Every structure is written in C-alpha cells, then in structure tokens.
Amino acid sequence: MTVGIARKLSRDKAHRDALLKNLACQLFQHESIVSTHAKCKEASRVAERIITWTKRAITTSNSVAQAELKSQIQSQLFLAGDNRKLMKRLFSEIAPRYLERPGGYTRVLRLEPRANDSAPQSVLELVDSPVMSESHTVNRGNLKMWLLVKSVINDDANQLPHNPLTLQNLHKVAKFKAEAQLHGEIMLIKQVLLKEMSLPYDEALENERTQALLKEVYSSSLPKKTKKPSSYVMVPRP
C-alpha cells in the first residue's frame, strides 16, 4: 500500500510495486544500492516500513499480531533464490540493530549524475551498518561514515581543526553506537583510506588522533544547529 504522494517512476502499479520490492530486497541483502534519486527515495519508504513492521513483530508477545506482521513483510519482498533467507536476516540481524532507534533507518545520499544520460543518481543505504564483518573484511555501504573519516584525515594532514559540521555528523553516528565500536570502525576506515591515498599508516599516531577526535565528538560543547527562519513573515494588518 502506498501512503501519501508517491512517484509513479514511469510504470504502472504492478511494475512499480515489483521494482520497489526488488530494490528493498537488494538493500537488505547488500546494505547499500545505487539507483536514480527518485527510485532510491521510494525504495527508502518501503524499507523503512518493512523495518518498522519487523521491529513490532520482534517486540510483540501477541502471536496473532506477529503472524499478521510477518505476512505484511513477506508481501513487500521477493523471497526466492538468493533472497530466501532474507526474513531470517531481517529478524536476527537488521531489525535488532534499530530497536533503540525511533526511525530513520535508511539514508539517501546524492551522487554525480549518471554518465550516459545525466539522470540524477543517489545511493540508498542502511544507517549504522557495521564497517567490518565477522570475518574481519570491509563491508559494503556506510558511505557517509567513509566520507566523514576522509574529511578527518584531510584535516589531520593539513594540521587543521576538525570541521564543526563533521563533528556534528559524527555525533549523530555515535548516538547509537558504542564508543569502542566507533573507535574500531574509524581506525579501520583510516587504514584503508590512507593506503589508497598512498599515505603512511602509523597505528599509534592514528589511535591517538582517533581518541582525541572522539573526545571532541562526545563533547557537550559541540555547535548546535541554528533554526532556519521561516520563509513566511507574519505582519499585522494596517
């Protein structure tokens, strides 16, 4: 079911629903997908709804309600072939990650326009995805985290203070992560990026820098967002 204003995506309802099901499955399978901006925005709505239903199914003690929620989830996914274990992954791995988060499980980041037709592209990803897998390999996704760490590396290389906006964004990331986990993920990303940039990786130095960075991130003196003025100004009648 589509609630509110939705993009038709140049398809009839059946083809549109099939497309969004496929995109949602790919997102839950790989934690990150690239598509046109419009498709990413619509797939984000579907994915958010599925995660909300899964959280409710996990936390409810009513077996009837749980069965209904599972049926709703299954109706929004293709559960054949490579996706046959997707329900298990949703309930055991993805939804538990967001039990303390009230919403905002996905993120859409704009990319450069597509080369062949200049269509606006974006990346759709699950927030708070682990950077490293259990086998200690780098996971796909979490583009925002990589961009933030790259900004930190550039600041350190140029001996500049960290950008307040970078600290604010890292503060948001840290809200639902343990400090030790965040420290480890930043160190891993630094190691990979410094190698790609052909820069030396001094573990002791980077560890010291990361600890100092996290002190800034968790500091209560972080700059607060300024409230944007309303576009309408109310004035009394003459």
From Swiss-Prot:
UniProt keyword terms in alphabetical order: Mitochondrion, Ribonucleoprotein, Ribosomal protein
GO terms assigned for molecular function: structural constituent of ribosome
Record's signal peptide: none
PROSITE patterns xref list: RIBOSOMAL_L17
Superkingdom field: Eukaryota
Protein location: Mitochondrion
Disulfide pattern: none
Described function: Component of the mitochondrial ribosome (mitoribosome), a dedicated translation machinery responsible for the synthesis of mitochondrial genome-encoded proteins, including at least some of the essential transmembrane subunits of the mitochondrial respiratory chain. The mitoribosomes are attached to the mitochondrial inner membrane and translation products are cotranslationally integrated into the membrane.
Self-association state and partner proteins as the record states: Component of the mitochondrial large ribosomal subunit (mt-LSU). Mature yeast 74S mitochondrial ribosomes consist of a small (37S) and a large (54S) subunit. The 37S small subunit contains a 15S ribosomal RNA (15S mt-rRNA) and 34 different proteins. The 54S large subunit contains a 21S rRNA (21S mt-rRNA) and 46 different proteins.
Family membership noted in the UniProt record: Belongs to the bacterial ribosomal protein bL17 family.
Note: Although this protein has evidently no mitochondrial targeting pre-sequence, it is efficiently transported into mitochondria.
Descriptive protein name: Large ribosomal subunit protein bL17m
Species this protein is from: Saccharomyces cerevisiae (strain ATCC 204508 / S288c) (Baker's yeast)
